[in-house]
Amino acid sequence: MDNKLNIVIITGMSGAGKTVAIQSFEDMGYFTVDNIPPNLIEKFVGLLNTPDNKIDKVALVVDMRSRAFFEDIQSIVTELTDNTSVNFKLLFLDANDTELVSRYKETRRSHPLAIDGRTLDGITKEREILADLKNLSEVVIDTSELTPRNLRARILQKFATSTESTFRIEVMSFGFKYGLPLDADLVFDVRFLPNPHYISELRDKNGTDQEVYDYVMEHPQSEEFYQNLMKMLVPILPAYKKEGKSVLTIAFGCTGGQHRSVAFAERVSAALREKWHLNVSHRDKDRRKETVNRS
């Protein structure tokens, strides 16, 4: 098994998409650093490349914002390439002059090397400075015709391993009386189901307890809802992934977030976990118990 530290340096033309790139690596679980001065890279890698280090993937953005130190970058790239204790790749993002000028006009920002505000002059100068670095790059992506979503997909295609999940599903339960979860993408209200709260022997239990789970699921409307829900979810989840979404949060709500919503979150997460990278959580499952204990 290869336990080497994986390092990707992201560089290229200003305006070519380095922000999208570093966000894509973050979604793949990389530890990311934006605009690191090149002369600090060797020391930074040394701190991480130790036996007790728990960070195994690092993506660093180096560009002309660090121009005072940029002359060091080629020697550092050479050193990392020759370093047998790390896996190193250099990613260069490029775009044609017309597209770069258009992007700068759209954002109304100045090019870091622009002379007297002339964007094209800055682009020309930057292209000359980066020419040798581009030739050293293992991966070059021209973003001229790529949308941010397309660029993200291209990066995932080239850098994501078969064992990495770039799309994660968060299944959660909550109680409406405590408010909607702000980060939920899909919210399902299960308050139409019979409430175990009114069964004395179930009141103090929750949807992770087998007795409560069985009570919730034994009703015909529960099974009908579950079957219809899965018919909807199964085809749309791949579409969310294809659109470039990194996390999809599916929330189930009942009155207090203790019984019905918990049971359904458990059942749905168990079904989806066979195919998807998934986490399940219960925001309000123990809130009533905590309130009673404080009183």
Swiss-Prot record:
Q: Does the keyword Methyltransferase apply?
A: no
Out of the domains of life, which is the source?
Bacteria
Keywords assigned by UniProt? ATP-binding, GTP-binding, Nucleotide-binding
User: What Pfam families does the annotation carry?
Assistant: PapZ_C, RapZ-like_N
Q: Does the keyword Kinase apply?
A: no
Indicate which residues the UniProt annotation says bind GTP: 63-66
Which one of the record's GO molecular function terms can you name? ATP binding
- Residues annotated as binding ATP: 12-19
| Family the entry assigns | Belongs to the RapZ-like family.
Function recorded in the entry? Displays ATPase and GTPase activities.
This protein is called Nucleotide-binding protein llmg_1557
